[in-house]
From Swiss-Prot:
Source organism per UniProt: Arabidopsis thaliana
Coiled-coil zones: none
Gene name of the encoded protein: UBC15
PANTHER family, alphabetized: UBIQUITIN-CONJUGATING ENZYME E2 (PTHR24067)
Full protein name: Ubiquitin-conjugating enzyme 15
Superkingdom field: Eukaryota
Length: 161
């Protein structure tokens, strides 16, 4: 993992605002199972509670996601991190950063907050063990000063969990 230049935080474009308002309306009518959006006045930053699926290692455990939308959403992926404490998972670092390809290189404008949440719940549900990534300490140490996970050049090598 290496770093690249940090994206700047700018106000949402008109397209991003329209898309997010539509997604929020759809979410409020039919939220994905296991998720609850905490309503605020900030369309650019969502807080979402995720509860582990029944029959999994994370059953009935609730964690919090923070989703920040870039100026050009949905052409650019949102930044999605777990707020402390992050679940122990082979693809979730203790600082909340998530190693999931759809949040980075495999992002598509056809994806939605709903589809991202379902992917994260699926990732949690398929885990055979609660453990941190092998390089957790090194990665977290290198992420000081609030570095965004979008500044990391991720290596997606394990799609089993």
């Amino acid at each position: 993992m290496t770093s690249s230049s940090a994206p700047s935080r700018k106000a949402l474009s008109k397209i991003a605002c329209n898309r997010l308002q539509k997604e929020l309306s759809e979410w409020q009518l039919n939220p994905p199972t296991g998720f609850r959006h905490k309503v605020t006045d900030n369309l650019q930053k969502w807080t979402i509670d995720v509860t582990g699926a029944p029959g999994t290692l994370y059953a009935n455990e609730t964690y919090q996601l923070q989703v920040e939308f870039p100026e050009h959403y949905p052409m650019e992926a949102p930044q999605v991190v777990f707020v402390s404490p992050a679940p122990s998972h082979p693809h979730i670092y203790s600082n909340g950063h998530i190693c999931l390809d759809i949040l980075y290189d495999s992002w598509s404008p056809a994806m939605t907050v709903n589809s991202v949440c379902i992917s994260i719940l699926s990732m949690l549900s398929s885990s055979p063990a609660k453990q941190r990534p092998a390089d957790n300490d090194r990665y977290v140490k290198n992420c000081k000063n609030g570095r965004s996970p979008k500044e990391t050049r991720w290596w997606f090598h394990d799609d089993k969990v």
